[in-house]
Amino acid sequence: DLFVFGGGSSGQRVERGSDLVQTLNITLEEVATGTSKEISVTHRKLCPTCNGSKAEPNSAVNTCSQCNGSGQVRQVQNTPLGQFATVSECPTCHGEGKVIENKCHDCLGSGLKKITEKITINIPAGVETGTKLRVTGEGDDSVNGGVSGDLYVTINVLKHDLFTRNGQDLYYELPISYVQACLGDQVEVPTIDGKNAKLTIPAGTQTETSFKLRNEGLKHVKWSGVGNLYVKVHVVVPKQLSEKQKD
């Protein structure tokens, strides 16, 4: 009996190009509206000199004499239990099935070359920190006819000076005076679109009371609907009262 170990497909190995990951910072205002960003991406693309062949132009590419172009070598050992055959990568051509006389001077025989390009990323409204956007084919190229890898852009939403976020809802801290809390008032609250919304504070409002402004939050990235803006008031009590306030 003959027992065979190792092996795999013969000839050139066709492998998919590597994926790339890059982080992109955006503001909360950009989350609210959606935006497009141009980023610089360094990836390995087919060498423009050899077009991925790895060989110097007009240089001979010969079939490997050790493996006859299969990219694999086979060794057979006789044992008391029978013959054992092992199949492994050809050490001469490293599994390529061919031997290049003169490697490309531009890519040093790798078939790929690093280039930096500008790519436009379309960011939908409502994304969160950690959201991954895939750009097909913008990873590393593959040699031997494989599919190019993809570029994954990981979103990082920067901290905002006024608002905090929970999902699609926004939160805002509003200081009001003791008089406003006692007598009530109508105030303006900033919103993420750069405008202001009116908020009515009823008389007798206690500190840390929250009010909801509907549809003043963020859009959802997958379906229609807008979050709310929650305004928490903090009553500022003066440490000293004027004579007029005492009266």
Where are these regions (language model features)?
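Charged, often glycine-enriched C-terminal and inter-domain segments
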Residues: 13-36, 98-247
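Post-J-domain flank of DnaJ/Hsp40 co-chaperones
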Residues: 1-106, 134, 141-148, 152, ...
